[in-house]
Amino acid sequence: MALRITPVTLQSERYRSFSFPKKANLRSPKFAMASTLGSSTPKVDNAKKPFQPPREVHVQVTHSMPPQKIEIFKSIEGWAEQNILVHLKPVEKCWQAQDFLPDPASEGFDEQVKELRARAKEIPDDYFVVLVGDMITEEALPTYQTMLNTLDGVRDETGASLTPWAVWTRAWTAEENRHGDLLHTYLYLSGRVDMRQIQKTIQYLIGSGMDPRTENSPYLGFIYTSFQERATFVSHGNTARHAKDHGDVKLAQICGTIASDEKRHETAYTKIVEKLFEIDPDGTVLAFADMMRKKISMPAHLMYDGRDDNLFEHFSAVAQRLGVYTAKDYADILEFLVGRWKVADLTGLSGEGRKAQDYVCGLPPRIRRLEERAQGRAKEGPVVPFSWIFDRQVKL
């Protein structure tokens, strides 16, 4: 989400400085989500390409984890099977999109669709912008499975590997796939949005990929997914609350059900990182600090509809204004993870580890202070057209 923020730079000893730009990009979940922190890689390639938008350019680092640490992940496969796979649900016990939608085989289908559309008419355009942005991000699921399979030591080496890491990745993907299916079909039936523009945006986004800067490291990767799943839980929970406020209890149920899945997935990913802190506290706190210095970028930050080069920033600004995902949420999530992993209580760290510990523990209040200053200076945002809603204009 976007805030108008005066540039401020804070220095942390031996750590890269971070700065808040005039208009920060607070990536919205799995949006994935980013912080109010500005990008440390300002270069932009503006050359138009047939299947991807202009994008930030930075040096891509690969395979940064020392090879010997791969053994850590092999050594805890038994633990993962017992403690991580339990957070998956058997398919026969999972909800499916059809459970929440008009039944096309029913004689009452037409009437059910009319009722859905009548409820949707009462919901404002800005809410639909956020709901569409969330759905598009969910629909880029092929990218997220690909990202998990870049991680050394835990990737699915065959496409049908029986290691618990590979089983988790495939089953997690299968569970997540229902989210996009459900939201996509709801939006199609609502009649409120331009489905062709939305579908183009999805194709552009999948074609563009993502680079969360996890460097093939499962340390960085699982810290990233821990943050993202909690951010998604927050975002879908807030869209549920707004839907209820607008009188659409069934849409609120849809968003709340998706949020519940995200919470369960968050639990699994945070348990993995908790285990890494137990086995390798120094390496894990260094990875945590590294990920936070680079900022948590949203998987959908390359969102593009063929028209608006700043589509993600515009979508994020609307979500920020509505309170669906905000700078405060970013700080709250970071503070939650610091507490969940008991980072402040770590002992026996190296000198670099202690500095990383101080950095991540001190970051949430620093973000909040800067956000409060930014809110004090915030100006009323402009209105921009969104192709997703037939170019109707929405205030940022």
Curated annotation (Swiss-Prot):
Record SUPFAM superfamilies: Ferritin-like
Compartment annotation: Plastid, Chloroplast; Plastid
Cofactor note: Binds 2 Fe(2+) ions per subunit.
Record GO terms (molecular function): metal ion binding; stearoyl-[ACP] desaturase activity
GO cellular component: chloroplast stroma
One GO BP annotation of this record: fatty acid biosynthetic process
Modified residues (Blocked amino end (Ala)): 34
Provenance organism: Carthamus tinctorius (Safflower)
Family (UniProt): Belongs to the fatty acid desaturase type 2 family.
UniProt pathway annotation: Lipid metabolism; fatty acid metabolism
Species lineage: Eukaryota, Viridiplantae, Streptophyta, Embryophyta, Tracheophyta
Entry comment on modification after translation: Most of the N-terminus is blocked.
Name of the molecule in the record: Stearoyl-[acyl-carrier-protein] 9-desaturase, chloroplastic
EC number per UniProt: 1.14.19.2
Role description: Converts stearoyl-ACP to oleoyl-ACP by introduction of a cis double bond between carbons 9 and 10 of the acyl chain.
